[in-house]
């Protein structure tokens, strides 16, 4: 069944037109959607021209897409080397025989660059991106701080930091910004990366707050990063969380 779908995809003109119309309709309304605008700005802040919104098909390309073009794209895609992951009780040899005889695996396939690491935007100074919107009832503020190259040996420390800073309502950010000072309805912050050699590590944060509290919320958020309060009573709980996470991931 999978082979037939790959080699002879049953593409339906009516269904495709319906999907294109749905996508075009979504694009038309997202320009006035505050959450979508905030997401697009965050993407541009982190990736610049590599943003998913900048890389997508233009409206014209979307409208003029046809089945023959889409079929050609599918046929081109299966010419590249593929990785197949199997989880189950069958022995390796059995799975290998089934897949090699059932899937359209081609000889001399094109080399793949997967997984592709998206280049992140670099900054030489503090930069603020701003979208004025009179219809926005709340301020959505994103933070992005590049932290250099990914290092596997720092994963545990980064996880501990994330629990300390953003571990639910007991996390430093939510506790200080929302619980103690009532400056936001939600807030978070964490060190993250794609987890691949050659990828970048960065701090990603967010505050959602009332418009009249935005400036004070940003000041408090940045003070937590530059002058981080110490909560030694939380360390044992964080260690316990990390141990349980390590056991569950085995």
Report residues per predicted region:
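His/Glu-based metal-binding/catalytic segments typifying zinc-dependent metallopeptidases
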Residues: 111-172
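Charge-rich, well-structured scaffold segments of protease-associated domains
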Residues: 1-113, 181, 186-250
């Amino acid at each position: 069944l999978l082979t037939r779908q790959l080699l002879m995809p049953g593409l339906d003109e009516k269904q495709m037109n319906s999907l294109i119309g749905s996508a075009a309709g979504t694009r038309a309304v997202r320009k006035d959607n505050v959450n979508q605008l905030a997401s697009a700005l965050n993407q541009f802040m982190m990736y610049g021209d590599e943003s998913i919104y900048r890389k997508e098909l233009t409206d014209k390309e979307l409208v003029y897409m046809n089945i023959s073009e889409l079929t050609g794209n599918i046929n081109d895609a299966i010419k590249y080397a593929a990785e197949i992951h199997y989880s189950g009780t069958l022995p390796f040899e059995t799975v290998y025989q089934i897949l090699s005889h059932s899937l359209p695996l081609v000889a001399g396939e094109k080399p793949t660059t997967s997984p592709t690491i998206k280049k992140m935007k670099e900054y030489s100074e503090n930069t603020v991106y701003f979208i004025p919107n009179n219809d926005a009832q709340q301020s959505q503020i994103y933070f992005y701080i590049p932290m250099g190259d990914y290092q596997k040996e720092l994963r545990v420390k980064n996880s501990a930091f994330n629990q300390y800073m953003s571990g639910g309502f007991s996390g430093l950010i939510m506790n200080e910004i929302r619980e103690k000072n009532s400056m936001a309805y939600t807030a978070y912050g964490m060190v993250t990366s794609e987890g691949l050699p050659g990828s970048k590590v960065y701090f990603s944060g967010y505050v959602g707050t009332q418009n009249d509290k935005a400036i004070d919320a940003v000041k408090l958020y940045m003070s937590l990063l530059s002058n981080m309060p110490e909560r030694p009573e939380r360390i044992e709980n964080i260690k316990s969380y990390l141990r349980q996470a390590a056991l569950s991931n085995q």
